[in-house]
Amino acid sequence: MSGSYPFIDIAALDSIREGFAKGDAQLVLTHDLSAVLWVNGPGAKLFGFDRVEDMIGGGLDLPIATRRQIASSNSNAEGETRTVSVRLGGGLRSDLTRFSVSHITLPDGVSGLLLTADGKDAEAEDIISGLSDDSTHIALIDANSRVIAASPRFAALDISSTTLEDLVIEAADATDRIVKRRIRAGKHSVPGAIARLTDTPPMHLLCIIGDAPVATLEAPAALQGEAEEILEEILPEPVESANTEDASTDQQKPRSFVFEQDAPPARFIWKVGPDGTFSEISPDLAATIGPNAADVVGRRFADVANVFGFDPDGSIAALLDKRDTWSGKRLMWPVEGTDLRVPVELAALPVYSRDREFTGFRGFGLVRPAEAEKDPEEIGLVLAGGIPQARKPVSEPVETATPVEDDDVLALGEEVANDDSPVATLPKPPLDIAPTPGRRESDKVISLLNACAEEKVAADQARMLKEREREERPEGGLTKTERNAFREIADRLRKQGLANSRAETETVAISDEPVIDSSQPVEKTEVKASLIDEVTADEASLPSSGMAYGDETALLANLPVPVIIHSGDKIHYVNQALLDLTGYESLDDIRGAGGVDVLFNSESDDGETRQGMVLRRANGSEEPVDAHLNAISWREGRALMLSLMPVAAAPVSVEAVAAPAEAPVAIDKDDEKQALADHVEELKTILDTATDGVVLIDPEGRIRSMNHSASALFGYERDETEGKFFSMLFAIESQRAAMDYLHGLSGNGVLSVLNDGREVIGREAKGGFIPLFMTIGKLPHTRGFCAVLRDITQWKRTEEELTNARKEAERASSQKTEFLARISHEIRTPLNAIIGFSELMADEKFGSIGNDRYRDYLRDINRSGNHVLALVNDLLDISKIEAGALDMQFEAVSLNDAIAEAIALMQPQANRERVIIRSSFQSNLPDIVADTRSIKQVALNLLSNAVRFTAPGGQVIVSTSYEMNGDVVMRVRDTGIGMTKSEVEQALKPFRQVNALERRKAETAKDWRSEGTGLGLPLTKAMVEANRAQFAIDSTPGHGTVVEIAFPPTRVLAD
């Protein structure tokens, strides 16, 4: 399919794929609406095209108002969607289609406009309609690898269910949802791609590029029989030749592979599954060593190695079992049709799925034909079934030839079998254009179905057969230009109106030539010699270097349909039918008169825009025409082929003929009024469907009308509000604001530009009140206004609930803080007494205790009291931080000095625990903006935790640094027991202690009361964040913990 982008790449984009799977009509346009970049089948059908390739790359003929409506969506921001209503169709009947217009970014970064129309009741066959052709096959695949819908010739590819399952799995693992590779189809592999469109339920789009087997392309019985009847009528007597049978045999015999030993090294890609079965090999290997020798897809590597005699020691098979990356493995591969074998170097990489499941190996290979050596087993001869034929030189003359008539008959049969349109609707042309497969386009034979033409064809047989070996025709017999031309003829001649409107013209044109009776033998038909001479002169006039170009124009020149080939405003070619219709003598006359612009005029003399396309003749007269546009290949580039068909005139009644000249004008005006009334009725229906209330206001502030939603919103009937002031719809406190808003818009002031709406309170007919959001706009012609009112009751209720929830949370936090403050005062007094008396008794100032056990009890009482006091202080601090009431005095703080003081305080405890504290401070470290007391508290907490959870003999390292990005960083590293990720998360929650504490207790037999309260790390983190710094912790069980506190550059007082 044509277009600047692969079709499946666009279909897999996130903004397109789900709508594509639903059957929505979609097309992508350039921002200036000049070209169609992409379209799906329903989108092409919506605009009157049967195939998407006929629409992609061409322009879109839209009315000026529609273009302006769509182009207005260019101002939308990325991701925003705007709904526009577009009237499609022409004449007296047209449909109003609603499109969603949004911006889309294509794979190469180009931005375009995406138009989407809802696909109502779309079937699976509708989704893939218009996508397939002779060489493109489409299918929809579900999650179970079943075919939901497929193009007519997809089944002929013979793709197995296992292959489809592999494609579905690969598409699920692909990050961009697309997989492109060669796919096993029967005994061959063809290029294809699969895209995952949706996830729930999964749906996949599969595209295959390749021709289906010939046996599956048979025509229906009806067409086959009709084609055979036509062949029997036009087939001339066969030309007897002694070598006919030999030539036919040579044509049917397949081409043998020829090994080129002097070819350069070739690279190829290969893939095997988890069981060692080849699943893919690129065609480069088959092109070098032969298709039979490279046909190993679906076979295990061990079996192939056993048959071909390579990898005797099983080293490569062992590497495939290890699932490791390997390279540099060399083996000798037999060459098809020879007694040689060539060295092949292989390398492979293991492939895993998204779930880390092993899916096989992907690798590349290097074939070196120049290093071929003798194969003692001569396996290559077995692969080809014997010694291959030697290659014949291109310049070898052809002594015998197959009759051209046989080729023409076969070509015509193939065209009839492959024609998509019904043969019965096509009138028989006076000339039979019969392309011959395998022949150059410049060597077509125009069979005139008479004896004289047969002699002319027989005389040119030798020349055509010699040039047949130089250049082959495309498969199918016709070029793309010819195929488009024939398809255009079929589409146009199928219409019944053409036969009625042109019956008389064709009769006159054909009457000058003898009528050929199909019941008589071809040999008895007489043709004027001048016609044969004209054909001979036309063939002789074509230059040898441009035979293909002359042949295209010769074909188009004989079409009965007016055709224009152009690119933009430049006309490349027009045929004789168009010159006859317009009255111009030549193409140069059309170019001199103004080109395309002078041929088509969309406005009448009075300035009114017409609905259809009108062709203007050279004498100034005009004729309405139907047009069909196709994108084709022309010369060495791309162009547009515009085919025209005059619109059949409607039958005129006797009353219309007898009526005066003014009657048609009156009828047109009545139709125009009716169409305008219908349009107004549609707009009213749209307004009544909207959920927002719409009120129309006159310049004096009185209500003109309102839609159904506004009537239901306020509880008024329409008649009750007409002519009354707009302020009656609002509560007293909002009436002034509403009227000020209205007057501000009428004055063309700032409000007319910055129109952001108002929140007002509406008043119902029964006296109730409604919170509303109102937006007013000016009407262009009547100087009135349009007010759009939206009920925001639910929004207000949600806002009130959120406000109440916030107040409740603040009240609970305040109560908690107040409770902790009271508790702290109540607990501190007895705690201070307990701690003081325990210290006094331990000093034995009033006498000796006399027992060491009592002294231990006093130390325990003192330590427990201090522990409870620290707990109360921590609770009070963390509650203040959560409430935002912590008293912070920000000033310049020397981080090195603060940490040094904390180390000095913790040094005695570290000595008792036999833990070494080391420091590494950066010199000239800039000061930071922080609270001095909280920074010292943070350092003490971190050092206390590090010493507490480090075994004797361990180390605690405290360091500071000034980073390149301007951060001042403090790090505390220990060699303690460490924590897992889950334990770190638990330790950062208040009142939570990790399970490692119990292990620590069992290992060191420490008192559990010295293990902390679970507030150390949460309080430290809260204080760090209160100082506008960042807190990070990294810990590994058995290796220790690293706590990092980073002060950003905004908190650093650098010089």
From Swiss-Prot:
Q: Which residues lie within the region annotated Interaction with DivK? A: 627-1055
Enzyme class (EC, first level): transferase
Query: Where are the Phosphohistidine modifications?
Result: H825
Taken from the UniProt entry, a GO cellular component term is:
cytoplasm
An MF annotation (GO) of this entry: ATP binding
Q: List the disulfide bonds.
A: none
SMART domains under this entry?
A: HATPase_c (SM00387), HisKA (SM00388), PAS (SM00091)
Give the UniProt keywords, A-Z: ATP-binding, Cell cycle, Cell division, Cytoplasm, Kinase, Nucleotide-binding, Phosphoprotein, Transferase
Cellular compartments annotated? Cytoplasm
InterPro entries referenced in this protein's UniProt entry, alphabetically: HATPase_C_sf, His_kinase_dom, HisK_dim/P_dom, HisK_dim/P_sf, PAS, PAS-like_dom_sf, PAS_fold, PdhS_histid_kinase
Biological processes per GO annotation: cell division; regulation of DNA-templated transcription
Give all residue intervals belonging to the Histidine kinase domain: 822-1051
Domain PAS, first and last residues per copy: 679-750
Q: What is its EC number?
A: 2.7.13.3
Positions of region (Important for polar localization): 1-626
Which domain of life, per UniProt? Bacteria
Reactions that this protein is recorded to catalyse: ATP + protein L-histidine = ADP + protein N-phospho-L-histidine
- Residues of the region (Disordered) are 419-439
What job does the chain carry out?
Answer: Functions as a polar differentiation marker. Essential protein that, by localizing in the old pole of dividing cells, controls cell division and maturation, probably through control of DivK phosphorylation status and cellular distribution, which in turn regulates CtrA, a transcriptional regulator of the minB operon. The asymmetrical localization of this protein is probably required for cells to enter a new division cycle.
Question: How does the record describe its quaternary structure?
Answer: Interacts with DivK.
Query: What protein name is recorded for this chain?
Result: Cell-division control histidine kinase PdhS
Lineage of producing organism: Bacteria, Pseudomonadati, Pseudomonadota, Alphaproteobacteria, Hyphomicrobiales
